[in-house]
C-alpha cells in the first residue's frame, strides 16, 4: 500500500514536468499579451524531433537541441501569422496544433513504421538519473527511507529539479 502510493507520487513528479513547463510558458505568453493555445503542438513537435534526433545521433543532448529548435520554429510561425500578418492568434495556435499532430503521425509512420511511435533509445543514450548520497542505505528506514529512495532520489536532474526550482518564478 505505502510503496504503491510512493510509486504514484514518483510517476506524478516525472510526468508533471512537461505539463508544468508548458503551463509556465503559457503564463509568460499571457503576461506579454499573446494568446498561445499552440503549446500542445509545440510540445508534440518538440517531443517527436527530440526522439528522432536522439535516435539518429544516439545522444539525448542532440535530441534536446532539436526540440529547442523546433519549438523556436513553431513559435516564429505563430509570431509571423499573428504579429506580422495580423492574423487571429487563436486560429494560428489551432493551425500549429493540427499541423504538429498530422506531421508527427505521418513522419513517424513513414520513417519508423511503428504506428507513429519512435524507437526506444538504449539506456546509454538517455539522460542519466541522479542517485542522491545514501539512497540505498536509507532505504531500510521505515517511511522516510522509502520517500528518500523512491520519491526524491533517482530522478533526472535536468527535468524535475529545473521545473520545481523555476516554478516559483512564475
State where each predicted segment sits.
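Alpha-helical transmembrane segments within multi-pass membrane transporters and channels
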Residues: 58-103
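Conserved small/polar residues in nucleotide/adenosyl-binding loops
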Residues: 163-169
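Transmembrane helix-loop junction
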Residues: 27-31, 51, 55, 79, ...
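Interfacial loop-to-helix junctions that mark the boundaries of transmembrane helices
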Residues: 6-10, 147-158
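Short, non-helical or kinked segments that cap or interrupt transmembrane helices
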Residues: 30-46, 83-96
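Alpha-helical transmembrane segments in multi-pass membrane proteins
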Residues: 14, 18-22, 42, 46, ...
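Extracellular/periplasmic helix-loop junction at the C-terminal end of a transmembrane helix
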Residues: 101-147
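Membrane-interfacial amphipathic/re-entrant helices at transmembrane-helix boundaries
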Residues: 1-22, 35, 49, 56-62
Amino acid at each position: 500500500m505505502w510503496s504503491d502510493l510512493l510509486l504514484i507520487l514518483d510517476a506524478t513528479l516525472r510526468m508533471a514536468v512537461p505539463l508544468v513547463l508548458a503551463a509556465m510558458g503559457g503564463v509568460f505568453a499571457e503576461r506579454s499579451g499573446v494568446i498561445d493555445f499552440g503549446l500542445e503542438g509545440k510540445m508534440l513537435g518538440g517531443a517527436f524531433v527530440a526522439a528522432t534526433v536522439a535516435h539518429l545521433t544516439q545522444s539525448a543532448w542532440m535530441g534536446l537541441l532539436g526540440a529547442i529548435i523546433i519549438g523556436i520554429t513553431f513559435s516564429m510561425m505563430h509570431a509571423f501569422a499573428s504579429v506580422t500578418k495580423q492574423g487571429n492568434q487563436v486560429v494560428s495556435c489551432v493551425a500549429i496544433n493540427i499541423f504538429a499532430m498530422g506531421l508527427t503521425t505521418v513522419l513517424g509512420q513513414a520513417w519508423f513504421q511503428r504506428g507513429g511511435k519512435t524507437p526506444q533509445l538504449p539506456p546509454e543514450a538517455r539522460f542519466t538519473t541522479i542517485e542522491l548520497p545514501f539512497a540505498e542505505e536509507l532505504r531500510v528506514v521505515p517511511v522516510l527511507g522509502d520517500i528518500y529512495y523512491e520519491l526524491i532520489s533517482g530522478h533526472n536532474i535536468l527535468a524535475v529539479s529545473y521545473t520545481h526550482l523555476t516554478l516559483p518564478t512564475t
